[in-house]
Amino acid sequence: MKVLVINPIMYTSETKNIKRAASIKDTMMYDFCLAFHEMGHSVTLVGGEPFKPTKSEIYPFEVLWWKCKCQKVCMPHCLPFMPETYRYVKQHRAEYDLIITSEVFSLNSLMAYRAAPDKTIIWHELAKHNAIMKKIPSKIWYGVIARLFMRNARVVARSVEARNFVKKYCMNTDVNVIDHGVNLDKFKASAEKDNSFVVCSQLIERKKIDGILEKFAKYLDQYNSTCQLFIIGEGELKEKLQRMAQTLGIAPNVIFTGKMTHDELLPILSKSKALLVNTVKDNNMISIVEAIAVGTPIVTTDVPLNSTYIKDYQLGIAKKHWDESDLNDVVSNSEMYIENCMKYRYKLSTKQRVEQFLEIERERLDDGKK
């Protein structure tokens, strides 16, 4: 099967000033396309040119970088506009068996669907209206554009919450949910854990890392004074958080590693007793998926959409407000949580995700023969 994957935003940028990464090989969408390739399919990945890596890379499949236009209005980090989408899909639609785009609220998804309606699947993540400009553009898009011009588009949501939201506007939303996947050949699991927790996050306001430091300080005081906390990531609040660790008297126990590649962070992530998340605004978090894939339980707020299956399968603790007692709980019951993660990790495989998409496409073809 020949597959086209259109994903302009290759990684998250909190501001319009996109900091180009050295490589895209640590991104979720790269691993997704790699799974197609390894399963014997021909795949082409399209990204927005502002996300093109700084160093030259060789890929086992075709990767195209398309220019983003009208950047003052259609900012590439949140609403990229690639005019090449419509021209390319219209011209090459006969060559592809399946076209996968990201998000219903997307000019590129609209163009791909209008150019090849029978071959396009929109992989949708948002479970509520986009907050840009007080939600007005989002409400107009879903209420008018999606209902009029994407009403019959095939949509596959990445969570139950996203499915329940988008099906109000796109009637052909699939009942099946396909979450982010992980390359299990890269993410090796470990049941052996060190005396440490880990945070994998941008160091920005909405991630509320300061709250994690406060809870960790109480955990050290009440339960385990020798435990360590690895904070992996960069961001505007790094120096403030380092000063806070000093003020709380926990600086010797907190290690700020900076941003790390997958190869660098995996030994830490796989050996930690839990991944800690304190976000107040997120959708599906790929760091949660990656932690479960290496057998590391989660302690998180109930904000990430992943929290639903964390609760359902007891992959850790997900609640509105967690505290130091929950850290003690995940450590005291680590054997159970780790075992559950070990069982669940196979559901997260990128190859499993590919098979789910192929099954949806097979069902469409079978329905067409009836």
PLM segments and residue spans:
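Conserved donor-binding/catalytic core segment of Leloir-type glycosyltransferases
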Residues: L4, A191-K218, F230
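Aromatic "clamp/platform" in nucleotide-sugar-dependent glycosyltransferases that forms part
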Residues: V280-K281
